[in-house]
């Protein structure tokens, strides 16, 4: 059973007719994030290309935050439950706090165009576990055009990496330009691929309009400590009563 959502979507997004076919919610790229909710868990989407390190980031965030706040995870894969299985086997959370969505379609469809399956998973988590502070929703691997509907998440993290060289940020796209947080991962590979991190920082800032409210963080997730700045950013998004003291 679906819950009511008090976050209207900018740009005229609207729910599909009850019982009708088609997407439940739609939101255009660039729809601004609103204030953090106080009546349910904050939902943070984690998107990015295949292999950029989304699952590694989610795992590191779970390890960093599990003892401090109440959280759950929803993963997306096209045909398998691979990412959820990895998180469970790694022991980053109690297995009951991790749910998997098999989209059977392009990853962006399930996080932007028809978010019903993901909303069901999110709402089932909250129904089964009670009040949570945070739910991380990991997208399946997609390209630079992938964005989440703000009917599904309250904040968006977009993960790219340096393996493709320092040109990736200036290729732009909604994820690079419009996400609430851009993470440039695998910085330890920069010398091996000839990527200039200063160039990536400059180009990423330019693509994001130099806005202080849309930061860029550089990470290497070879150890969980590499996600500490991202964890701090996530905690800062929580409404004040939910933030650990």
Swiss-Prot record:
Keyword Repressor annotated: no
Annotated transmembrane regions: none
A single GO cellular-component term on record: cytoplasm
Biased composition (Gly residues): 9-22
Main location: cytoplasm
Record's subunit section: Homodimer. UreD, UreF and UreG form a complex that acts as a GTP-hydrolysis-dependent molecular chaperone, activating the urease apoprotein by helping to assemble the nickel containing metallocenter of UreC. The UreE protein probably delivers the nickel.
Gene3D superfamilies: P-loop containing nucleotide triphosphate hydrolases (3.40.50.300)
Protein species of origin: Parafrankia sp. (strain EAN1pec)
Family statement: Belongs to the SIMIBI class G3E GTPase family. UreG subfamily.
Record's keyword terms, sorted: Chaperone, Cytoplasm, GTP-binding, Nickel insertion, Nucleotide-binding
Region (Disordered), start-end ranges: 1-43
Binding site for GTP: 48-55
Protein name: Urease accessory protein UreG
MF-aspect GO terms: GTP binding; GTPase activity; nickel cation binding
Function: Facilitates the functional incorporation of the urease nickel metallocenter. This process requires GTP hydrolysis, probably effectuated by UreG.
Domain of life: Bacteria
GO BP: urea catabolic process
Protein location: Cytoplasm
